[in-house]
Amino acid sequence: MLSLDFLDDVRRMNKRQLYYQVLNFGMIVSSALMIWKGLMLITGSESPIVVVLSGSMEPAFHRGDLLFLTNRVEDPIRVGEIVVFRIEGREIPIVHRVLKIHEKQDGHIKFLTKGDNNAVDDRGLYKQGQHWLEKKDVVGRARGFVPYIGIVTILMNDYPKFSYAVLFLLGLFVLVHRE
């Protein structure tokens, strides 16, 4: 049985080995965080990787697709570009396409978005009284994607017990593989 074998392995470990395994797990977690921060610096985006959570961008992107983002300040936003934006009062960013751009005489640019699979533009999603998005609302712009790889993230959000199981299995893997 897996659980009994695992417990026997843990019991056979001396304190030094157990301490080493805990440190090893800590190194894995801290390495992942450093890689994330590095990606943030390189891409200029607060969230360089996002998962598509709905079918609003089909057929371009499907639920569970993993998007790679950049957010260079100097690059102008263009019609047809896919952006990830955050709306005040909503925790989760939205992935949609730029539908229209509105440029004022002073050079200030605002834009309107829409999901490819939606019948109407996103004005109904914006906060009340807001009709356009601004560059400050953009988290990033889609530069590439990997299909369906983010479905694990969706499962972890939809089923919290699944996320605990994944974390437990990762911890178990680190403890059992001592090399």
Swiss-Prot record:
One GO cellular component term: signal peptidase complex
GO molecular function: peptidase activity; serine-type endopeptidase activity
Membrane topology qualifier: Single-pass type II membrane protein
Topology, Cytoplasmic side: 1-16
Annotated keywords: Endoplasmic reticulum, Hydrolase, Membrane, Protease, Signal-anchor, Transmembrane, Transmembrane helix
CDD domains associated with the record: S26_SPase_I
Subcellular compartments: Endoplasmic reticulum membrane
Pfam families the record matches: Peptidase_S24 (PF00717)
Name this protein carries in UniProt: Signal peptidase complex catalytic subunit SEC11A
